UniProtKB/Swiss-Prot annotation:
One of its GO terms (biological process) is peptidoglycan biosynthetic process. Catalyzes the interconversion of L-alanine and D-alanine. May also act on other amino acids. Belongs to the alanine racemase family. Keywords: Isomerase, Pyridoxal phosphate. The keyword Isomerase applies. This is Alanine racemase. PANTHER family: ALANINE RACEMASE, ALANINE RACEMASE, CATABOLIC-RELATED. HAMAP family: Ala_racemase. Its EC number is 5.1.1.1.
Length: 328
């Protein structure tokens, strides 16, 4: 069966490198949403904990329950309040109109819209939001924002930073000992992080976004069959690839049902073993020159992202959670 190998030493190296930049492991919030961006949240959670990480963020209550044994603090980023929230978790408040829908005495982090205009409360409406929170039975323990253009070389990043500083100054008049976090992976290496803030790290912890980091995920496939493709014979749906000479080919057990982008046989998609995929990818398999029982499909999601004109995030998060993941 296909396999994802996670390099434990590389992951630990990345976390140490990032913690050194921030100042400590205690100021890290590891974002493990969507199965840790496809890498395997339950596999990585104990590694992060053992290094000193105590705070993580996930998408949903279901994701939080999968790793709650490992962390003291788990922030749920995309929750729709239903009145039966778990006091074990912390919930992002993305819309002030939802205050009344939460269970009483639940811990929340207030999301501030500093310019991305996706989720959160605008700075102009913060005073009203503070009044509603203070009159409710919710426990405000933190406040955060998300930078829309931290990886762009324009001024919007700095405008958002300034807006968040204004929000912090305002909320500090009414609440003390709040946990603030604004810097994400893209913002991590763009200057100094405020001393009163934590840092949310997403894809950067897995080796992307800085040349000093190490990729931790490698995708492997295993051989299903092998044959001699004779000169003039074609392989796969539509016969896109035709052999110009006799060649030994093999079919391997990964396809678009496993979360891979479907290769249509056009252009040269080079696999991690240096061989090109031959013909169209099938639902559960692909073909290439015979390279043994196990081959590396990719070690760097950027290569596939460039080929399919997308981003590395999409390549990784689409990887089927049913693919076995192991530490190496």
């Amino acid at each position: 069966m296909s396999l994802i190998k996670i390099d434990q030493k590389a992951y630990e190296y990345n976390l140490r490198h990032i913690a050194k930049k921030i100042g400590s492991f205690q100021r890290l919030i590891c974002v493990f949403k969507d199965n840790a961006y496809g890498h395997g949240a339950k596999l990585l959670a104990p590694l992060a904990k053992n290094l000193g990480v105590s705070f993580v963020a996930v998408k949903s209550e279901e994701e939080a329950r999968e790793i709650e044994e490992f962390f003291e603090n788990i922030l749920i980023l995309s929750h729709r309040p239903h009145g039966n929230e778990n006091s074990r978790f912390i919930y992002a408040l993305n819309d002030i109109s939802q205050v009344k829908n939460y269970k009483q005495d639940i811990k929340i982090h207030l999301k501030i819209d500093t310019g991305m205009h996706r989720n959160g409360i605008c700075v102009e409406n913060l005073e009203h939001a503070i009044d509603l929170i203070r009159s409710s039975n919710l426990k405000l323990t933190g406040m955060f924002t998300h930078f829309a253009s931290a990886d762009e070389m324009d001024g919007s990043f700095f405008v958002q930073k300034e807006n968040f500083q204004k929000a912090k100054k305002m909320v500090k008049k009414y609440f003390s000992n709040l946990l603030f976090h604004s810097h994400n992976s893209a913002a991590l290496f763009r200057g100094k992080i405020p001393e009163d803030e934590y840092c949310r790290i997403g894809l950067v912890q897995f080796g992307y976004g800085d040349s000093n980091l190490k990729r931790i995920l490698s995708l492997y496939a295993h051989r299903l069959s092998q044959r001699i493709l004779q000169k003039g014979q074609s392989i796969g749906y539509g016969g896109i690839f035709t052999a110009v000479k006799d060649m030994e080919v093999a079919t391997y057990d990964l396809g678009y049902a496993d979360g891979l982008f479907r290769y249509n046989g056009k252009g040269e998609l080079v696999l991690g073993n240096g061989k090109a995929m031959l013909g169209k990818m099938s639902m559960d398999s692909f073909s290439c020159e015979n390279s043994g029982e196990e081959i590396c499909v990719f070690k760097d999601a950027d290569i596939w992202a460039d080929f399919f004109h997308t981003i590395n995030y999409e390549i990784l998060v689409k990887l089927n959670p049913n693919i076995q993941r192991v530490l190496v």
